[in-house]
């Protein structure tokens, strides 16, 4: 089918990146299981390399299509907006499953857990130490990404650059603190249902922070190369929506698992 028909919609060309992305994701998850059971990270690292290369090349192609070829017309961006909204909704339900598992176990702890929460022998984190600092960091990053967005809409290139830079720095800082918390944790993912739900929920949130930080880094690189304008910057908007979603999920995690659950 011709991609040059007289209509405003973008009929994409054949692309290998969905296939290589699926292979990378499958290899990463398989490697994670192998790492847990056979203590070798080879397959896990290979999967990550494939996934990162796919992300780089897919983002490169989308940037070319939207910025240099002008294929992201107004009707196309409306479709992209709805796609991002539905993706975030699916992510909300993904995290609901973790909260469901947590409350299922914590609201009525069984006799195997000592009929108490946290279970007998589990020393929970102090919610007013690193978790509270992480909360402040993510809330601050929400402010800086909004600052960058408003600056971009007003055509203020330097302030948008500063806002994006500070958001990325705060995202990296959050990830470092989360990794430090995991290293110092007095329990593991194998320590009862508390360890399982804690690491699954906070670990997947940490993964989303990494993805969001990467998303913002791509936007930062595109922004300093003048890919965005006052009226045409959906890539940045999508990253900002995703970052606010990550903020809100962390607030729920902090209130339920760290504060109430401790």
Curated annotation (Swiss-Prot):
**Cellular location(s):** Mitochondrion inner membrane
Q: What is its main location?
A: mitochondrion
Membrane-traversing stretches: 39-59, 83-103, 120-140, 163-183, 201-221, 240-260
**Might you report a single GO cellular component term?**
mitochondrion
Q: Which reaction does it catalyse?
A: 4 Fe(II)-[cytochrome c] + O2 + 8 H(+)(in) = 4 Fe(III)-[cytochrome c] + 2 H2O + 4 H(+)(out)
The cross-references to InterPro entries, in alphabetical order and at most eight, read: Cyt_c/ubiquinol_Oxase_su3, Cyt_c_oxase_su3_dom, Cyt_c_oxidase-like_su3, Cyt_c_oxidase_su3-like_sf, Cyt_c_oxidase_su3_a-hlx
Determine the domain of life of the protein's source: Eukaryota
Give the way it sits in the membrane: Multi-pass membrane protein
Q: Which CDD domains match?
A: Cyt_c_Oxidase_III (cd01665)
The similarity comment for this entry is: Belongs to the cytochrome c oxidase subunit 3 family.
Q: How does this polypeptide assemble, per the annotation?
A: Component of the cytochrome c oxidase (complex IV, CIV), a multisubunit enzyme composed of a catalytic core of 3 subunits and several supernumerary subunits. The complex exists as a monomer or a dimer and forms supercomplexes (SCs) in the inner mitochondrial membrane with ubiquinol-cytochrome c oxidoreductase (cytochrome b-c1 complex, complex III, CIII).
Function, please? Component of the cytochrome c oxidase, the last enzyme in the mitochondrial electron transport chain which drives oxidative phosphorylation. The respiratory chain contains 3 multisubunit complexes succinate dehydrogenase (complex II, CII), ubiquinol-cytochrome c oxidoreductase (cytochrome b-c1 complex, complex III, CIII) and cytochrome c oxidase (complex IV, CIV), that cooperate to transfer electrons derived from NADH and succinate to molecular oxygen, creating an electrochemical gradient over the inner membrane that drives transmembrane transport and the ATP synthase.
Name of this chain's protein? Cytochrome c oxidase subunit 3
Native source species: Anopheles gambiae (African malaria mosquito)
Which gene produces this protein?
Answer: COIII
């Amino acid at each position: 089918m011709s991609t040059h028909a007289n209509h405003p919609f973008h009929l994409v060309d054949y692309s290998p990146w969905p296939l290589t992305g699926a292979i990378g994701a499958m290899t990463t998850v398989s490697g994670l299981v192998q790492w847990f059971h056979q203590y070798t990270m080879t397959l896990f690292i290979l999967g990550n390399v494939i996934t990162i290369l796919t992300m780089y090349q897919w983002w490169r192609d989308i940037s070319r299509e939207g910025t240099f070829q002008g294929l992201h017309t107004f009707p196309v961006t409306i479709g992209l907006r709805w796609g991002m909204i539905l993706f975030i909704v699916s992510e909300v339900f993904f995290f609901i499953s973790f909260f469901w598992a947590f409350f299922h176990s914590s609201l009525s702890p069984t006799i195997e857990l000592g009929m108490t929460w946290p279970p007998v022998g589990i020393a929970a984190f102090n919610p007013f130490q690193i978790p509270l600092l992480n909360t402040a960091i993510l809330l601050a990053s929400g402010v800086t990404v909004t600052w960058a967005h408003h600056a971009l809409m007003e055509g203020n290139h330097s302030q948008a650059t500063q806002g994006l830079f500070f958001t990325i720095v705060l995202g990296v800082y959050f990830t470092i603190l989360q990794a430090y918390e995991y290293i110092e944790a007095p329990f593991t993912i194998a320590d009862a249902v508390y360890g399982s739900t804690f690491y699954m929920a906070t670990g997947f949130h940490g993964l989303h922070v990494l993805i969001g930080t990467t998303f913002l880094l791509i936007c930062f690189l595109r922004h300093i190369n003048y890919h965005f304008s006052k009226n045409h910057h959906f890539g940045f908007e999508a990253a900002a929506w995703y970052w606010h979603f990550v903020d809100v999920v962390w607030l729920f995690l902090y209130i339920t698992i760290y504060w109430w659950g401790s």
